[in-house]
Amino acid sequence: MASIMNAILSQFDSDTLDQLSGQLGTNQQTTGNAIAAAVPLLLSALSRNTGDVQGRDSLYNALSNDHDGGILDNLIGFLGGAQQGPGQGILGHVFGGSQNGVVNALSKATGMDASSMGRLLVTLAPIVMGFLGRTRQQQGMGPSGLAGLLGGETEYAQQAAPGLMGTINRFLDQNGNGSAVDELAGML
């Protein structure tokens, strides 16, 4: 099975990056690098959320009821109104009160200013959920299958970009134990 992360990243072609960069006030390279850092982090946080039955079922129900992937049918159109979309609410569920810390960590890791990074995450969250919802639907996944998919995505991200994921983990690892998992758990 192809990586969800790669499928999401492949949606950001030159035209899409140009539009998004214009909205964020950044260049395409900075935007592309920030997307490449933010998508695996979002997938990892969602994976962590599926670590218990309640979180797994909650994510499954959200995907089943609200995120069928239709957003992907007109991505350029969505980008035009993304700040009014469901992204802020999704981020609130995923990161809770630690959202600002996540934004600041990604900002430091990528060089994108925190304000632009926050707006980028608001834009990316519904896209990631749309991909997961569409994949869940196409593959007939139940809650356990979804948790397995997200766990595989987290492993793939670690293997594909160990340096980047290591940098992000260092910024998120507030207690210095070498893992951001406990901090992500506290965020969820």
In which residue ranges do the predicted regions lie?
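A structural "flexibility-hinge" signal
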Residues: 1-188
